[in-house]
């Protein structure tokens, strides 16, 4: 093995450790609630820069990425990344408060610095992450999901095992759970984590893998039943609709979906019982309303699983045509009902669905108010600010300037638009929003062209879920770095298998040689123990170092 190959192998191991630290360890990193936002931001900022600089140093001394990893001239995704970065820098330089926009002080630390370090992390992962890490990384995300969910449930019932909220009033804790803090941040994590966890269970073969990925899926069903956020329901629903349209959707997939449905209805029924018999602080998730029919739903899922398991006797029947019809009916039906509910005054009430379909200032826990004032603030800006924005994190300031003396107490509570795309329009302008949509479209187009390659489907579903979730949520430092790393992983998985790509073609008239014996693959423990250990250690070290490096932010 040449020195360049050794350096490339070290870089691949480092990129794996980086992904473990960011996707599995970082969601569990926490400090006191009063500093939760800055603690999470400074820790992940230090982590991303540390790994990006380390991988950059390896590249400088000879660790050359595989061919096709960073094709600057042909790849529109890289140009889109440059556009996103430049638009963020320009909008920060022209911001209402450049210093606040650089650090994101006015908007959950989602400022220019986050754009810069996530771009660096994206390039580092895309350059060196190995294609063979999906199964282990997915299992790690599943373990993290289970831990986050359990802590979330315990905090709902006022049980704080790790003392995180010891200094926080009980009334405040009603809105803050687990290690990610506020419930909407938890829903953002679950929006991309649950599709990875559920997909691994859907495609698992054999008893060992089914049980291995079934345990995180069981806790994923619990997360769906307890995480109090409409965005999670929207994100998971969008991912399911995309899954139904794929050729891989068969009776076997439906059977596994029935098992996941059984997990969900079991937990929803249990939570309904607990809410009626035990005091809880948490709100009531939209999906938890199905707890009223928890027993019926569980039995229906069990019956569906039994029919598909025993009646078909192991045969797999394609269902993607039916799935596409169902997805089309759901989308068209939702659009028609929304239009009728909002535009036809005499349209009959649909009960609780009215809270979802009818848009007004009270929609989605006053998200309607946030959307209205954000749009009005953008329309009130001069043309050049419409194009370039008021600066990252400046939504609250822009709204205050627009409303003036007419600002209400409700308006004062919003530091984000609760719609990532609408907030980008205000803070980075038409240019910034267009750059981000270009970046997203370039990646999803590449995913559609390479859907059948290993790893593409689960990562795409995770990103689709997050992008749908972002319609009614906010971009924060707790979640966005992981999303950028998933975009980078998607590009890695879309490439042809690199083992086949590096095989040398034999000469035209050369004598045929016997194929070399395949290299012995290391065991799972030997393969994953070093990156897991390194990832956890780096997360701990970067978390501690961030308190010193970014002391001025605390």
Segments (PLM) and residue ranges:
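Membrane-interfacial, low-structure loops and terminal tails that flank and connect transmembrane helices
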Residues: 1-9, 62-74, 283, 311-323, ...
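Alpha-helical transmembrane segments of multi-pass inner-membrane proteins
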Residues: 3-32, 44-57, 82-93, 111-123, ...
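Extracytoplasmic loop-helix module adjacent to an early transmembrane segment
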Residues: 46, 163-170, 354-383
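Transmembrane alpha-helix boundary signature
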Residues: 55-71, 89-103
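Membrane-interface coil-to-helix junctions
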Residues: 76-79, 182, 374, 417-419
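Alpha-helical membrane-protein architecture signal
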Residues: 173, 371, 388-391, 414-422, ...
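TM-adjacent membrane-interface loops and short helices in multi-pass inner/ER membrane proteins
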Residues: 182, 366-413, 428-432
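Hydrophobic alpha-helical transmembrane segments in integral membrane proteins
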Residues: 340-354, 538-554
């Amino acid at each position: 093995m040449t020195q360049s190959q050794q350096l490339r192998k070290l870089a691949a191991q480092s990129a794996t450790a980086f992904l473990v630290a960011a996707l599995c360890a970082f969601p569990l990193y926490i400090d006191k609630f009063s500093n939760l936002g800055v603690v999470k931001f400074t820790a992940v900022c230090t982590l991303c820069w540390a790994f990006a600089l380390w991988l950059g140093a390896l590249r400088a001394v000879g660790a050359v990425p595989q061919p096709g990893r960073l094709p600057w001239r042909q790849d529109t995704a890289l140009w889109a990344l440059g556009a996103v970065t430049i638009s963020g820098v320009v909008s920060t330089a022209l911001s209402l408060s450049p210093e606040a926009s650089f650090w994101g002080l006015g908007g959950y630390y989602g400022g220019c610095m986050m754009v810069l370090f996530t771009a660096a992390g994206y390039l580092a992962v895309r350059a060196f992450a190995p294609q063979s890490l999906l199964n282990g990384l997915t299992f790690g995300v599943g373990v993290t999901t289970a831990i986050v969910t359990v802590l979330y449930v315990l905090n709902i019932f006022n049980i704080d095992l790790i003392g995180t909220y010891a200094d926080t009033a009980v009334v405040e804790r009603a809105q803050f759970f687990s290690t990610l803090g506020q419930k909407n941040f938890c829903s953002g994590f679950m929006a991309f984590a649950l599709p990875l966890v559920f997909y691994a269970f859907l495609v698992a073969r054999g008893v060992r893998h089914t049980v291995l990925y079934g345990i995180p899926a069981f806790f994923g069903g619990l997360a769906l039943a307890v995480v109090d956020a409409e965005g999670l329901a929207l994100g998971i629903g969008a991912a399911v609709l995309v899954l139904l349209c794929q050729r891989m959707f068969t009776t076997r997939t439906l059977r596994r979906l029935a098992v996941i449905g059984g997990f969900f209805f079991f937990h929803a029924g249990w939570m309904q019982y607990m809410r009626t018999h035990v005091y809880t602080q948490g709100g009531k998730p939209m999906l938890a309303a199905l707890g009223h029919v928890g027993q019926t739903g569980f039995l229906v899922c069990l019956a569906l699983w039994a029919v598909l398991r025993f009646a078909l006797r192991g045969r797999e029947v394609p269902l993607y045509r039916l799935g596409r019809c169902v997805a089309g009916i759901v989308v068209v039906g939702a659009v028609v009902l929304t239009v009728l509910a909002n535009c036809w005054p005499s349209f009959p009430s649909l009960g609780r669905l009215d809270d979802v379909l009818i848009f007004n200032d009270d929609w989605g826990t006053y998200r309607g108010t946030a959307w209205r004032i954000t749009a009005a603030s953008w329309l009130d800006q001069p043309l050049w600010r419409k194009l370039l924005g008021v600066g990252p994190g400046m939504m609250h300031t822009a709204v205050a300037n627009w409303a003036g003396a007419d600002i209400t107490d409700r308006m004062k509570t919003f530091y984000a638009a609760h719609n990532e795309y609408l907030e980008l329009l205000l803070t980075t302008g038409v240019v910034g929003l267009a750059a981000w949509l270009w970046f997203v479209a370039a990646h999803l187009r590449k995913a559609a062209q390479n859907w059948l390659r290993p790893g593409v489907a689960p990562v795409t579903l995770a990103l689709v879920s997050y992008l749908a979730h972002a319609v009614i949520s906010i971009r924060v430092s707790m979640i966005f770095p992981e999303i950028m790393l998933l975009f980078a992983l998607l590009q890695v998985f879309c490439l042809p298998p690199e083992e086949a790509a590096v095989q040398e073609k034999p000469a035209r008239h050369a004598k045929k040689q016997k194929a070399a014996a395949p290299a012995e693959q290391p065991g799972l423990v030997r393969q994953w123990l070093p990156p897991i250990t390194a990832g956890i250690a780096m997360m701990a070290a970067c978390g501690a170092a961030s308190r010193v490096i970014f002391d001025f932010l605390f």
